[in-house]
Amino acid sequence: MLLSISLILLVGMSVGWICKKMRLPSLLGMLVTGIVLGPYMLDLLDGSILGISAELRKIALIIILTRAGLGLDLSGLKKIGRPAVLMCFVPASLELLGILVIAPKLLGISMLEAAILGAVLAAVSPAVVVPRMVKLMEEGYGVREGIPQLILAGASVDDVYVIVLFSTFLGMIQGESASIIHFINIPISIFLGVGIGFLIGVILAYYFKKVHIRDTSKVLIILSISLLLVVLEDHLTIPITFSALIAIMFIGIGLQKKREAVARRLSVKYGKLWVAAEVFLFVLVGATVNIGYLSKVGVKALIVIAVALIFRMFGVFLCLLGTSLDKKERLFAMMAYTPKATVQAAIGGIPLSLGLACGEIVLTVAVLAIVLTAPAGAFAMDLSYKKFLKKG
């Protein structure tokens, strides 16, 4: 495992640095590192680290979501109002609809199997989007119009919505009835996540005011609580649950509301943690990619992904109708909502592991979506934000 950690960090950072020098997103180099070092090519990564890959990827996601919460300016989000709510589910719903229209004909799968594929593909990647929106907020691009806040909040809730749909469709194909409680749980889990996270943030702000400890210790406390929330969500067996990822982001928001100076300092600390977490996240996502699968569906999978993205971007366009955003700002939001990586890597292989007939197709299309959209979406954002968004 020690050799694997060394390879992940050294090779991942080096190839990422080379990509950055070539004006490409560093995550592209990290993804390529994972593909090459992973079990489907050179097989240099130890099985023990691949065995905890999902947990390590989740820790990385926790780090960037907490950092996002610590720096999120809610005043910009309040200005936008209605579109902020619509961005949480309309683009994902339209993408799912697009896949339902085209996938059964092209890939020869049933409507329910297409719904499972759509639920896997319809999530935007917080691991790609969130750090870039945090960067935009720090540099002041689009903040007055609330663009990074809108995309950041929408992308986080979008994932929760899609994962609940995925669980529901998976249950249906295994013979369970589609219970209304599953759909009622979507808004409830989001609101409970907001409430629980904000309350914890406020309590921590009060605690940090009364008990003087180092900022590093504060980070460890917040990180530990975040991990506990994830474990609690995973182990809850009741029909109504809460979203741990949204709760984690709102811990940062609650802390920021009560102790802004502390939140700013902790955001810097989390930024340093993200340097290592980003490498692990994208190298391990790359390690899940089985290149051999891709040749099996090839062009048809490409068409499905392209149609899905067109439907998704149209969904973003609809959400932003009636806002004060200009054409360039809307186009940026549409591009920012295209990258896929985290959720697809986390749930793309579940149908195959359950022995479903559509499992291999779902995993293949998910893998192709990661390889194509994560670097392309990141590249589009990195290249366009200074041209498309206003500073200050």
Predicted regions and their residues:
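Transmembrane helical cores of multi-pass secondary ion antiporters/exchangers
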Residues: M1-G392
